[in-house]
Amino acid sequence: MAVRMTVILPLAMALICLMQAEPATAANNHIRTVLKLFRTIDLDDSKKSFYLTAAKYGIQTQLREPIIRIVGGYLPSTKLSEACVKNMISEVYEIEGDFYSKFSYACEDHAPYSVECLEDARDDYLTQLVELFKETKKCLRE
């Protein structure tokens, strides 16, 4: 009996460790894929730094972090739709362009390129990013 326990116990422990490592590995792969795709977002560095900070912060908090939380919970067998994420990234450029226009030449009540214009345009920008997240969430799995 003691011999069986010395053989079975290490095998049981190895099986438990293997079962715990597999979902974490898959989650890391899904997260790594999403982060790689988000790193392809290239905003124009010639724009004002406080504008770029606001634009990047919106993308990070309204898109990247929520999507990473979702794909981090996917099982290893789940297929992540890279096309869905790439489509979302192309729409990010359109939303960011709209944000920039409201911050710069389309600003009505304040001087163009001012912090006041940025504040006025930010709410609409974040709302559009949240809507994009809701759309993207529906198509993340293939």
Swiss-Prot record:
Cellular component aspect of the GO annotation: extracellular region
Miscellaneous field: The protein is equally effective in normal human and properdin-depleted serum indicating that properdin is not involved in its inhibitory mechanism.
Purpose of the protein: Salivary protein that potently inhibits the alternative pathway of complement system activation in the host while having no inhibitory effect on the classical or lectin pathways. Binds and stabilizes activated host C3-convertase complex C3bBb (C3-CFB) and inhibits its convertase activity. Enhances accumulation of C3bBb on immobilized properdin.
Name by which UniProt lists this protein: gSG7 salivary protein
Tissues in which the protein is found: Female salivary gland (at protein level).
Disulphide bond pairs: C84-C139, C107-C117
Cellular localisation: Secreted
Pfam families from the UniProt entry: Aegyptin_C
Signal as UniProt keyword: yes
InterPro entries: ALL3/gSG7_salivary-like_helix
Provenance organism: Anopheles albimanus
Assembly: Associates with activated host C3-convertase complex C3bBb (C3-CFB). Interacts with host properdin (CFP), a regulator of the alternate pathway of complement.
N-terminal signal peptide: 1-26
GO molecular function: toxin activity
Keywords: Complement system impairing toxin, Disulfide bond, Secreted, Signal, Toxin
Keyword Kinase applies: no
